[in-house]
Amino acid sequence: MSAPRNVSPPRNESALLSPCPKAAALALLGGASLLTLVIAATPSCAEGTAAATLSELSIEGAAASSLTVPSVAAQRAAVNATVGSVAFVDAKDFQDRYANTLRDTLKDVPGVYVQERYGQELRLSVRGSGISRGFHLRGLELLQDGIPLNLADGSGDFYQVDPLGLRSIEVYKGGNALTFGATTLGGAINVVTPTAQTAFAPNILRIDGGAFNTIRENVQVSRISGPVDFLVNGTITNSDGYRDHETQRTQNFNANLGYQLAPGVETRFYAGVYLTDQKLPGTLSLFNALNNPTLANPSAIAGNQSRKVETERIANRTSFPLDVGKLDIDTWAIHKSLYHPIFQVIDQDGWTYGIAPHWAGTFEVAGYRNDLILGLRAFAGQNSAFQFVNVAGQRGAQTLRAVQSASNYEAYGENRFWFLPDVALMAGAKAFSSNRTYSNKGGFSGANAFPASANETYAGINPKVGLLWQPLPDLQVFGDITGSRDVPDFSDLVQQNTLNTTFVLLRAQRAVTYEAGTRGRIDRLSWDVTLYRSEIRDELINFSINPGLNIPAATFNAPRTRHQGVEAAIALDLARDLIGTGDAVVVSQIWTHNDFHFLADPVFGDNQIAGIPRDVLRTVLTYRNREGFHVSPSVDWVPQGAFADHANSLRVPGYALLNVQAGYDFQNGVSVFVDARNLTDARYVSDISVVTDARTVAGGPVAFYPGVGRSIFGGIRAGF
């Protein structure tokens, strides 16, 4: 029986599917020498770079792949075969912009809310995951090449993700991430690094620069030799930042080595080193955020607050084709060292390690096609957590010595049964058991004088069922019901203030999500639209104790809440062959509607959950011709800002940002671009450290991250 037909990518993927590449390697990145090499790229390289100069109106054909890493076309097809809301982003859609953070790569994906705080620190939320957390990541699994980046307790941050080291991004919203074993409310985002087979070119040199004394250098080299292939990518970024005390220094190194052990058997090793030194500007009052946005919080300066992270990661995937399907076995280990002077000096060092076999195959059942995925995941980790009095960013007297341990055991499966040629019934489930153990070793004055320990085990089953109807090759309609569980991480469980540290037993967040949607293309019109509703019990809700001092938020279980919304992206080819043969004008509209609120809460009633605005819109108009010129003006519009408190007594203003991107791709493999943002220098609030009731804070909460003002960046890239 023939395979079910997957939705073909639209001609202009940036208009729809993009909504919906240790120190030894880094030493290669000398700034002046890199710029010289970029400019020196010659036309003799043109033949080898033809694939890197892509017309937006070309449909990408089959690209090279390997057993461990499918081609980009196959990655897209696998994502689009999902019964549920997903998105695929090809790196070519953001390589001609200043892509420093995940916002720069995901801002065209409906349903994904990404807002900058400072440097690479973001609020990243899908369908309200971790909605009111004012730092890092919760409720969403972040993977690289299908292998988790999150720590064993489920927490994560964004500093390991280098946009210049990526080939594609896969977004699986909510329970649709079951293909990885992820069943959190937000789902999973899988960033895929290039291999020698999928890289744009064997050699890539790039330098970006611009506002706030920003300069970034990137180099990538890849080769194939018989059964061996390798790729090395390194990026150095230096920037003073928009605000005072926001200096950013990062060094990212990614590499992979593939080897064909035997015909049809392949292993691939991944290695990464990620060094971050980020000064923290802190939050401001609403007045200062809107009128003096470049200021730093005085407490941030007095405490020389910063975040210094050294992370090393090694992983392996070994793939075996079987008589039916393919077996992948993933193993990984992550070492992370954190030095983080904020209200106190947070000094942590820990390891996360895991193994995950995964089988996927297609076979017939009574003459009907059946697609089956089965997987196991076992991962654990331990983190030494010390705290000290913060003396201008240096360790003072020690106040805490603790050990945080987490373990997780999971089994999952998903089946698609094609009972009609164009209709599939999907069913799946995940069973899990997760333990969190905290041991305070004591020995200090005050609340941490005596040893104390606590642990909690969370277990459950998350089911999933749905239907996929594909009446045409370029049209899908789907509906599904999924269950999710979010287990608290140690930032939730270990709550602290200036006086003590306490382990708080919290319940796991449970949700049932209903969604229905459609995606496809008919002639010049492309779309991806999903409606969803999540009924949530015991949602993990955060509020900041004192955001001005950068004290981590407290967490509680809200008895009942509801998240519902619309995720929509629509693109229309307005004109073709407008000025010359092969050029096109495309308009795209992305709309994310967020309705997140308490349900008969004993304290907050039916109030909106603070932290995320109700509507987020983005409009992009793109012109591109066959000679390589492209220009894209865009508007980011938030009609009404988010509430700053769960009492709904304070709301930040809405805003609109005008941006323009332009560039030229030369035939010799050299590309140049300009990325101009917030051209009107609008003053706005980008993110909030949510409080319970702003009316009770004397002088008003110091809880606001100002948005970045007018900024212009440019870059030059050579692929040969």
Can you name each region flagged by the protein language model?
Residues 75-76, 83-86, 103-147:
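Extracytoplasmic beta-strand/coil segments of soluble accessory domains associated
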Residues 537, 575, 585, 637-642, ...:
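C-terminal beta-signal and adjacent terminal beta-strands/loops
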Residues 202, 209-238, 243-281, 306-315, ...:
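Transmembrane beta-barrel wall of Gram-negative outer-membrane proteins
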